[in-house]
Amino acid sequence: MKARNESMSKGEYKTKSLKNRPDPTQPKLKKPSWIKAKLPSAKHIGRVKELKQVLREQGLNSVCEEASCPNLGECFGHGTATFMIMGHICTRKCPFCDVTHGRPNPLNQDEPRHLAKTIHAMNLNYVVITSVDRDDLRDGGATHFKNCTQAIRDKMPDIQIETLVPDFRGRLTVALDILAQQAPDVLNHNLETVPRLYEEARPGADYQASLDLLKRFKQMVPETKTKSGLMVGLGETFDEILQVMRDLRAHDVEMLTVGQYLQPSDFHLAVQRYWTPEEFKQLEQAGMEMGFTHVASGPMVRSSYHADLQAQGQFS
């Protein structure tokens, strides 16, 4: 793969070959007043720097930084983080996502040990482990997920672990069999958007395959909670989101997050609409009526934002 031209931004390089490439000259919608990320308080700034330093020393990546999450300051300030394993280079080029695309490096076989050591040093009670897509690996990275989960549990037997997994395209059966050998407390896989927008927003992904992943794992490991996440603002309708929620419940998904899509750069998909706090509240109420055990729905909600409280049904 050719190296990125230094004059080209990460977003421009990532989306330059897409069939439906976003138009960087498209006028941008003005952000409403309710789109505000919380900055870390003065007392938490030191903690944010400390956690970033720990990640660098252990050679680890946090999705909080790689995906430019708007809640980074708040979550790091409170001493929580979502760890991204298997490197920071993704084999997919979804035009809504700010993670780097390209040819990934070989797996770091010491990463599970380093990850467990770091989590132990941070004294976390709940941890979220996610990854880039690794279509270059025969099992999609499932064995590495399993090894990381095992290493963490060996170091901290009482910790709760949530894994936010990719779709394991073309190798789902093998991947699920491996993941079930060391099952997390919560298995999360994000549908991201409505099926009508998959070709544009999730090229290479399959809506039904993602639903099947969630249902099949729940059937294999009934005691593991299943979870998914959606973003809104790409042009979907309220009714389309409700239908996706119904599909999730029909596939035994118990927990849901819904948040506003925010454009990482001019070269990513543009925001078509900002949903109001009232609409997010309506989605939360509808989800609870459908039978979800918990729904976190709000403009700044992200898949792993306050994941520990979501798992305990304490965050709204």
Curated annotation (Swiss-Prot):
<dbReference type="Pfam" id="PF04055">
    <property type="entry name" value="Radical_SAM"/>
</dbReference>
<feature type="binding site">
    <location>
        <position position="75"/>
    </location>
    <ligand>
        <name>[4Fe-4S] cluster 1</name>
    </ligand>
</feature>
<dbReference type="InterPro" id="IPR003698">
    <property type="entry name" value="Lipoyl_synth"/>
</dbReference>
<feature type="compositionally biased region" description="Basic and acidic residues">
    <location>
        <begin position="1"/>
        <end position="15"/>
    </location>
</feature>
<keyword id="KW-0479">Metal-binding</keyword>
<dbReference type="InterPro" id="IPR006638">
    <property type="entry name" value="Elp3/MiaA/NifB-like_rSAM"/>
</dbReference>
<feature type="domain" description="Radical SAM core">
    <location>
        <begin position="76"/>
        <end position="293"/>
    </location>
</feature>
<comment type="similarity">
    <text>Belongs to the radical SAM superfamily. Lipoyl synthase family.</text>
</comment>
<feature type="binding site">
    <location>
        <position position="64"/>
    </location>
    <ligand>
        <name>[4Fe-4S] cluster 1</name>
    </ligand>
</feature>
<keyword id="KW-0808">Transferase</keyword>
<feature type="region of interest" description="Disordered">
    <location>
        <begin position="1"/>
        <end position="33"/>
    </location>
</feature>
<dbReference type="GO" id="GO:0051539">
    <property type="term" value="F:4 iron, 4 sulfur cluster binding"/>
</dbReference>
<keyword id="KW-0949">S-adenosyl-L-methionine</keyword>
<feature type="binding site">
    <location>
        <position position="304"/>
    </location>
    <ligand>
        <name>[4Fe-4S] cluster 1</name>
    </ligand>
</feature>
<feature type="binding site">
    <location>
        <position position="69"/>
    </location>
    <ligand>
        <name>[4Fe-4S] cluster 1</name>
    </ligand>
</feature>
<dbReference type="InterPro" id="IPR013785">
    <property type="entry name" value="Aldolase_TIM"/>
</dbReference>
<keyword id="KW-0004">4Fe-4S</keyword>
<keyword id="KW-0963">Cytoplasm</keyword>
<feature type="binding site">
    <location>
        <position position="90"/>
    </location>
    <ligand>
        <name>[4Fe-4S] cluster 2</name>
    </ligand>
</feature>
<dbReference type="InterPro" id="IPR007197">
    <property type="entry name" value="rSAM"/>
</dbReference>
<protein>
    <recommendedName>
        <fullName>Lipoyl synthase</fullName>
        <ecNumber>2.8.1.8</ecNumber>
    </recommendedName>
</protein>
<keyword id="KW-0411">Iron-sulfur</keyword>
<dbReference type="GO" id="GO:0046872">
    <property type="term" value="F:metal ion binding"/>
</dbReference>
<keyword id="KW-0408">Iron</keyword>
<dbReference type="GO" id="GO:0005737">
    <property type="term" value="C:cytoplasm"/>
</dbReference>
<dbReference type="GO" id="GO:0016992">
    <property type="term" value="F:lipoate synthase activity"/>
</dbReference>
<feature type="binding site">
    <location>
        <position position="97"/>
    </location>
    <ligand>
        <name>[4Fe-4S] cluster 2</name>
    </ligand>
</feature>
<feature type="binding site">
    <location>
        <position position="94"/>
    </location>
    <ligand>
        <name>[4Fe-4S] cluster 2</name>
    </ligand>
</feature>
<comment type="pathway">
    <text>Protein modification; protein lipoylation via endogenous pathway; protein N(6)-(lipoyl)lysine from octanoyl-[acyl-carrier-protein]: step 2/2.</text>
</comment>
